[in-house]
Design a protein with these regions (language model features):
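Solvent-exposed, non-transmembrane regions of membrane-associated and secreted proteins
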Residues: 1-179
């Protein structure tokens, strides 16, 4: 598979680079990295691997852009400075969502525009918790499992989003921390 011309130079600089994520009218406009052997390598490193408290956006090791996963899970810090994924919190406001229904995630192989289907706050669960774990979904075994994931996300959203997803659609999940 050929790498898009617009990303070839970035990929030559760092083979961990897998794409670019941006959301209009936010500070979210960053490269996305992935390291198969060390999922959190970029949690406190910049694009070049140097220390950075903000880190760089990175995809979960269970996500794949080569054989596209049903869901690509991308992590980023919620920086008080407004950088990285801080502006995801704007989706708590329905008016913001209504004016920003689309997210651009281009991989090194192709461009992708994703329509927002859910926006919510949750927590990382303890082992014994039986609650919905959005961060464990990558590939659905069947339509039922896919629909269960989408329904779980929509149920946590504080306002109504009419957009639906169907089995076979490609999803991205953007995940950050709250403080």
């Amino acid at each position: 598979v050929l790498i898009q011309k617009k990303y070839a130079a970035l990929y030559r600089e760092n083979h961990s680079f897998i794409g670019w994520l941006s959301i209009e009218d936010t500070n979210i406009d960053y490269p996305v990295m992935q390291t198969p052997d060390d999922e959190e390598y970029y949690i406190h490193r910049d694009f070049y691997g140097a220390y950075s408290s903000a880190g760089t956006l990175f995809a979960d090791t269970d996500s794949s852009i080569q054989r596209p996963s049903d869901n690509i899970l991308i992590y980023g810090h919620n920086m008080k400075t407004g950088k990285m994924f801080h502006d995801l919190l704007k989706y708590e406001d329905e008016a913001f969502y209504k004016n920003h229904k689309y997210i651009q995630f281009d991989t090194i192989y192709g461009n992708g525009t994703y329509e927002v289907i859910a926006a919510f706050r949750t927590r990382i669960m303890n082992e014994e918790d039986q609650d919905f774990r959005y961060y464990q979904f990558f590939n659905a075994a069947d339509a039922s499992e896919f629909n269960q994931f989408v329904s779980g996300c929509k149920a946590l959203t504080n306002y109504s989003i009419d957009t639906e997803a169907s089995y076979g659609d490609s999803l991205i999940t953007l995940s950050t921390c709250a403080y």
